Amino acid sequence: MTNMSWSFLTRLLEEIHNHSTFVGKVWLTVLVVFRIVLTAVGGEAIYSDEQAKFTCNTRQPGCDNVCYDAFAPLSHVRFWVFQIVVISTPSVMYLGYAVHRLARASEQERRRALRRRPGPRRAPRAHLPPPHAGWPEPADLGEEEPMLGLGEEEEEEETGAAEGAGEEAEEAGAEEACTKAVGADGKAAGTPGPTGQHDGRRRIQREGLMRVYVAQLVARAAFEVAFLVGQYLLYGFEVRPFFPCSRQPCPHVVDCFVSRPTEKTVFLLVMYVVSCLCLLLNLCEMAHLGLGSAQDAVRGRRGPPASAPAPAPRPPPCAFPAAAAGLACPPDYSLVVRAAERARAHDQNLANLALQALRDGAAAGDRDRDSSPCVGLPAASRGPPRAGAPASRTGSATSAGTVGEQGRPGTHERPGAKPRAGSEKGSASSRDGKTTVWI
């Protein structure tokens, strides 16, 4: 008994702590601290010499052993050890059932998670036809889209990597989903939260362990009552200083003396109190479960609480103003182009703007000529030409690209210069008083 180890039973009881209510955790604390520790530390030290120092006033061989057997049919310490083991047996059986039940639920949830796995890799996106018949394909323009192709390759690589990682972490995800589904939710399993506070009762109900839990509570309470009655019948409420014995082979009634009777009496009363406290905790836990179930039933009959009013619908996103008609892009136009092609597109836009300005200037010149009193005069006698209009009949052509060049430092117009050959060109000249525009 001096080398008795309680580690195995303590580990089992600590595991029960994870599947019990708040009152059950208090009962477990009382059992471990006041019963196991007191019995292992105090009881062993107090009752270690109970038989060695139990002496009788006779020299008859065997009389001392017979009288001690009559005084204590079962040693106090061994009785309390047996009591702890028997009372802990229902809890250990409940723990075994709970672990088995949760393991089966975990396996079922893992299989469901495997069935809910996503399908195979999606097919590559088909090449979309041009939205309008008049718009050519990007290949017809001789333009490449390297960044778009790179993006597709990266997307495929990321998809493959994600699927590989998903296959590697398949079982871990299934176990995590099972833990969440089975009842590992802290807010619903006994931890205080903003929505409410409870002590594990709902978790036991959710795991389907309520009947087994109540059964082990009833068994524990019955064992407590039985051991209280047995302890009273065996030892009473005190350890008497001397014990009269008349059993054979004692020649007559002899008096036997017990060592440290007061200390043993105090310890015996402490064990009575601990047993009564454990019995009271069992009764309180059963009452707690009954009242909690009754409250849940009443709330279920009343119906769910009124839900909060639905939030107001969010306004639609702001509509941004559309781009100008002359600069609008097709819906599938890609802005991801190379730097040289961006410059080319910029020059093309400048040429289009210059051409539009020339057309507007020509139209304004025709209106002025029709309204001028000197209609028959030659063009040279009408004064200097307006800005943006051709200078003379045989003057040099004005390149449309010079509009962009005027904004560039260090560039000057040269009369007679030809348009650049890398972009679309537009110029205008005046022949016979008419304006001709070509691109």
Swiss-Prot record:
The modification Phosphoserine is found at residue 371. Its main location: membrane. GO terms for molecular function: gap junction channel activity; gap junction channel activity involved in cell communication by electrical coupling. The keyword Phosphoprotein applies. SMART domains: CNX (SM00037), Connexin_CCC (SM01089). Residues 378-393 have a biased composition (Low complexity). It is a multi-pass membrane protein. Keywords: Cell junction, Cell membrane, Disease variant, Gap junction, Hereditary spastic paraplegia, Leukodystrophy, Membrane, Neurodegeneration, Phosphoprotein, Transmembrane, Transmembrane helix. Residues 47-78, 238-265 are extracellular. Residues 112-125 have a biased composition (Basic residues). Residues 1-25, 100-216, 287-439 are cytoplasmic. The keyword Transmembrane helix applies. A connexon is composed of a hexamer of connexins. Interacts with TJP1. It is linked to Leukodystrophy, hypomyelinating, 2: An autosomal recessive hypomyelinating leukodystrophy with symptoms of Pelizaeus-Merzbacher disease. Clinically characterized by nystagmus, impaired motor development, ataxia, choreoathetotic movements, dysarthria, and progressive spasticity. Spastic paraplegia 44, autosomal recessive: A form of spastic paraplegia, a neurodegenerative disorder characterized by a slow, gradual, progressive weakness and spasticity of the lower limbs. Rate of progression and the severity of symptoms are quite variable. Initial symptoms may include difficulty with balance, weakness and stiffness in the legs, muscle spasms, and dragging the toes when walking. In some forms of the disorder, bladder symptoms (such as incontinence) may appear, or the weakness and stiffness may spread to other parts of the body. Belongs to the connexin family. Gamma-type subfamily. This is Gap junction gamma-2 protein. It comes from Homo sapiens. The gene is GJC2.
